[in-house]
A protein has these predicted regions:
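Charged (often Lys/Glu-rich) extended helix/loop segments that serve as interaction or gating elements
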Residues: 1-118
Length: 118
């Protein structure tokens, strides 16, 4: 089964570049047993935009919140605006408390430095 996330290689190029491997879970369905292996693809128009190949998850449903664990400290530095996608926020979690440390970009942020034609 294929699950398409709203992230991808523009914010985490490590699986495509280095074959980095991650574990994932559906945040609100942690107690449900896996249904079958799921491949998690990103949203870029690239055949290599796959974040995880065949990970055991419950049957994904629209709106599920996917968590990919321990993606690393360098993802933000490696992220780009490829395909004009805004970069995500960075959230630190400590003792069950979440804190945003970098706000997510908007499309206006991505386009702000473009110079219109004369």
């Amino acid at each position: 089964m294929l699950f398409r996330s709203d992230g991808g290689m523009y914010e985490n190029p490590r699986p495509a570049l280095y074959q980095a491997r991650y574990e994932a879970a559906l945040a609100e369905r942690l107690d449900e047993p896996p249904a079958r292996p799921v491949t998690i693809a990103g949203r870029c128009c690239e055949s290599g935009d796959v974040l995880i190949w065949e990970t055991p998850l419950p049957e994904p449903r629209p709106g599920d919140l996917l968590v990919i664990f321990s993606t690393g400290a360098y993802n933000y530095a490696m992220a780009s605006n490829y395909n004009r996608y805004p970069r995500p926020a960075i959230v630190f979690v400590r003792d069950g408390q979440a804190r945003t440390v970098v706000e997510r970009e908007t499309l206006d942020d991505v386009l702000a430095r473009d110079v219109p034609p004369a």
